Regions:
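Positively charged n-region of N-terminal signal peptides that target proteins for export
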Residues: 1-4
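Small-residue packing motifs within transmembrane alpha-helices
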Residues: 6-7, 307
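Bacterial N-terminal signal peptides
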Residues: 7-14
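Noncatalytic, solvent-exposed loop/strand surfaces
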Residues: 19-597
């Protein structure tokens, strides 16, 4: 009988190794791992052809109609483990508006009625070279109401894979634990007791750590029938939740996470609104009127990040004031570790990113007022602040040295935002002047690391204001639109510029029709979370409708046109264990690669 020990031990070792390899090459969550680094240790394929195309959002034409032709929906990243793919699919009902855009006047249609849609998590599997449906799980999750706070930008629905299960967001702050193989419910986890409150929402993607714990944000909002949940009432509750592998859950309130933040009815610094006082700041000593902060809560699409040492990172903001924002660190038992304010960190405003007008030309376009203090944000007359907006999907990224990146929004650099870097102890280190709706990808190499982020320059708006009658708000030209690789100090190493100028669409017969020179300065990069493979190859989407693979040195490796040049909320992509690329365009899942190696 003792002779059986060696085969049994060998079998255990082999099973353990196979499990570790499956996990190493999986894409189980936002940003691939709990640090959200966007890196996977496989060699990505060259996207030479489409291998699959599946519609997951049938409401795209209606969504575009209500958004003036754009697609303002944040979608889940395709989750992958082995030969299985897990993706959101939308069903239910889209309520059309009597007149396109009338939801903006409060009509119960379009984004104001997106709770009539149904969200499903569907398992797909590769069989005989085709990606086919395996099972479907219909959840009761709904997004936060649009109200006057989300402006038609649909929040993200985002499960996570962990230890053989799919954790799927549910209603009332709950999570469904679903068997990964067959879609059967294993348990329904409710951290808030037996009640399921329809005005309590799982907010943002779920994050799974290496120990099988799952983390997510929850917020409770006012019933829209009582008051607008964003500006008519303070947030009623906000929590970070941790679910252990045994389904036990624990919560901590955001009020406890940011004890030094302004209170719900305290005043927070405002911005200048009166366009008759342009150029801003109105005077060297002007101070904008304050307004109520609101209680602290997470940003709508924020996923917690988990460092290898167990530290948890999330983003908090005032309910009424996105500038009253913090990077928050927690211990693994959900006790507060530290909080770092994002306010008044930047000195790159007037005189740097924005010229200060000369006395001889006080109305110089896109300039600060004569005599302005160098470095200030002209909209506040104070050092610039990173803000946490509910319209983006930026999420903390933990770097190899333990420091943390966050993408934030700033208005005064033509809405490009800033990528901010903090130390593991909460000290502010530096910034790069783009960060809007971005979770950057990280590539370790040569004893250091590099960071990849989109770097769009937006046109059609002024640098810091929107009055078309004022020279201070002269619209900027579009572009350039770059993918930029930064070093560890957030200094550019290379930039890859989008040079596509024509708008194309794929016809039903597979042919492609293009209209030339619609975008003479190129297209935006339509990416909120890039992918980097083991060779340093970067994979990104563009609003020109193509998937791009960029070499490690920033040159083009290959690009593949998918379906349609489209203006859209930025989308993520992922890689499978065999290097296939899973990307998105026009509400459709595309798989690209070199062939059908099954």
């Amino acid at each position: 009988m003792k002779r059986l020990v060696i085969p049994i031990l060998c079998g255990i070792v082999l099973l353990t190794a196979a499990k570790a390899e499956l996990e190493r090459t999986a894409w189980p969550q936002w940003g691939q791992n709990a640090q959200h680094s966007g890196f996977i240790g496989v060699q990505g394929q060259t996207p030479k052809k489409q291998l699959a195309q599946i519609v997951y959002d049938p409401f795209v034409p209606q969504e575009q109609t209500e958004a003036g032709g754009e697609l303002l929906v944040h979608y889940q990243v395709p989750l992958i483990e082995g030969k299985h793919v897990y993706m959101e699919f939308k069903t239910g009902t889209w309520v059309p508006c009597s007149t396109p855009g009338s939801w903006g006047n409060g009509e119960a249609c379009g984004p104001n009625a997106w709770n009539q849609e149904i969200w499903n998590e569907k398992a797909l599997a590769w069989r005989d070279g085709k990606l086919v449906a395996d099972w479907n799980f219909q959840t009761d999750w709904k997004p936060e109401p649009n109200g006057f706070g989300l402006n038609g930008w649909e929040p993200v629905f985002h499960p996570a894979l962990s230890r053989g299960f799919v954790y799927v967001p549910g209603a009332g702050g709950t999570v469904w634990k679903v068997n990964r193989e067959n879609g059967h419910v294993v348990s329904h986890i409710n951290p808030f007791g037996s009640m399921v409150d329809p005005n309590t929402f799982v907010s943002g993607p779920l994050t799974a750590d290496a120990h099988g714990n799952v983390y997510y944000n929850v917020m409770q909002l006012e019933d829209p029938a009582v008051a607008d949940p964003w500006f008519g009432s303070d947030v009623l509750g906000a929590w970070l939740v941790k679910v252990k592998p045994n389904d036990q859950s624990m919560t901590v309130t955001y009020a406890d996470l940011v004890p030094g933040a302004p209170g719900a009815f305290d005043n927070c610094p405002g911005i200048f609104f009166d366009t008759t006082t342009l150029p801003w700041p109105p005077s060297p000593t002007a101070v904008p009127d304050p307004f109520p902060c609101g209680s602290q809560r997470p940003g709508v699409n924020v996923a917690p990040a988990i460092a290898p040492d167990g530290t948890i990172y999330t983003l908090s903001r005032g309910h009424f004031d996105q500038f009253a924002a913090y990077l928050v660190a927690l211990n693994s038992d959900l006790t507060p570790k530290w909080q770092a304010s994002l306010q008044n960190r930047f000195t790159d405003g007037c005189g740097f990113l924005i010229p200060i007008a000369a006395s001889a030309n006080p109305n110089q376009p896109n300039s600060c007022r004569v005599g302005t203090t160098p470095g200030v944000d002209p909209t506040t007359n104070a050092p610039g602040s990173g803000s946490v907006t509910d319209l983006g999907s930026s999420t903390p990224t933990v770097l190899p040295d333990g420091s943390v990146l966050i993408g934030t929004f700033t208005l005064y650099n033509a809405e490009r935002g800033h990528l901010m870097k903090f130390s593991a102890s909460g000290a502010y280190l530096t910034a790069f002047d783009f960060g809007w709706d971005s979770t950057p990808a990280v590539f370790r190499h040569d004893g250091t690391y590099s960071i990849v982020i989109k770097d769009n320059h937006y046109g059609g708006i002024g640098l810091y204001c929107f009055d078309p009658t004022s020279p201070s708000c002269t619209p900027l030209p579009n572009g350039p639109y770059n993918i930029t690789r930064l070093n560890a100090d957030l200094k550019p190493e290379w930039k890859f510029k989008n040079t596509t100028t024509g708008s194309c669409q794929r016809n039903p017969d597979g042919s492609v029709t293009c209209t030339p020179n619609t975008h003479p300065n190129g297209f935006e990069w339509c990416i909120n979370a890039p992918v980097i493979d083991e060779n340093g190859t970067v994979y990104v989407n563009s609003e020109d409708g193509s998937l791009y693979a960029l070499n490690r040195n920033g040159t083009l490796k290959h690009k593949l046109f998918l379906n349609l040049a489209i203006g859209a909320a930025y989308t993520p992509l992922s890689l499978g264990p065999d290097g296939k690329i899973y990307t998105q365009n026009d509400g459709q899942l595309f798989v690209a690669g070199e062939g059908e190696d099954e």
